[in-house]
Regions:
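Flexible "arm" and connector segments at domain edges
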Residues: 1-65, 71-278
Length: 278
């Protein structure tokens, strides 16, 4: 007989019990054979779907997606519980301990009370405590600790921010833009030379990739200086491009045409006309 109490409303303990049942010998054939690796992508997808709920300003969608993300946390925790490494209470305890330790301006008492009246002071404090708790002896280690699994744009911006907090000279936006313009000029020069050169394509690819990477990294630094979120900026522009593309295609279809029947020049003119008016 199934040892589970059906209710009109459930809580976190019920979720943990459901996961335990699903992973048990008589549980779900799919759930009980999953590993951290097999559901790793699911975890990433749920994080992005939570972000979509935020971007759409939809409380209902956000509630659902946060639930799906919580399921992933419970799933991974149950796997570790079965292996005797840690359980959900351990996870909650660790994050509570971390929050208390990293907020001495709120939870500190006596000599442990630290003054932090501004956002910058809080972040500076947070970084110092994080560095100490992770036994990072050098600033380079703080840069290396930014996960390599992060999207490249996000990782680049985080590295730039941490380098700046370590005392790296803060360039002005104008200096950063000038550097980007110089690199674009160098890229243009290389492409011109490559069009005349009969050398290996792989060599040209490596050269272009290197300088494009440097340009993108400098854009990460520019985002930091301007206090801009590169992910949001690129998402906005990508969405704007799709909207413009749809408008162009809809207009062509109304005229009885088709995108694949237009020349490149005709399509570019139509696209530029739409996007300039947005």
């Amino acid at each position: 007989m199934l040892d589970f109490e059906f209710k009109s409303r459930y809580g976190i303990d019920d979720l943990l019990k459901i996961m335990k049942i699903l992973r048990s010998e008589n549980g779900c054939p799919w759930d009980k054979v999953q590993t951290h690796e097999s559901i790793r992508t699911d975890l990433i997808e749920e994080c992005y779907e939570v972000c979509e709920g935020i971007d759409k300003n939809s409380p209902e969608m956000l509630k659902e997606e946060l639930g799906d993300l919580l399921l992933q946390i419970a799933f991974h925790t149950q796997i570790e519980t079965e292996q005797g490494n840690f359980n959900f209470e351990d996870v909650c305890n660790d994050i509570c301990q971390k929050l208390i330790y990293r907020h001495p301006h709120v939870f500190g008492e006596g000599e442990k009370k630290i003054k932090a009246d501004t956002e910058d002071e809080v972040l500076k404090n947070w970084d110092a405590l994080k560095k100490a708790s992770k036994q990072q002896n050098t600033y380079t280690e703080t840069l290396e600790s930014v996960p390599k699994t992060f999207p490249a744009l996000l990782r680049g911006e985080k590295v730039c921010k941490r380098a700046a907090r370590a005392g790296l000279p803060i360039n002005s936006a104008e200096d950063c833009i000038k550097k980007i313009q110089e690199q674009l000029g160098e890229l243009s020069r290389r492409i011109s030379l490559q069009s005349e050169d009969k050398g290996e394509l792989s060599e040209h690819f490596a050269q272009n990739q290197q300088i494009l990477g440097e340009i993108l990294f400098d854009f990460c630094n520019l985002n930091r200086i301007l206090k801009n979120d590169g992910e949001k900026a690129l998402t906005y522009s990508t969405n704007r491009f799709i909207m413009a593309f749809r408008a162009v295609e809809d207009d062509i279809i109304k005229q009885g045409g088709s995108l694949d029947k237009l020349s490149g020049d005709e399509l570019n003119r139509a696209f530029n006309k739409v996007i300039s008016g947005m």
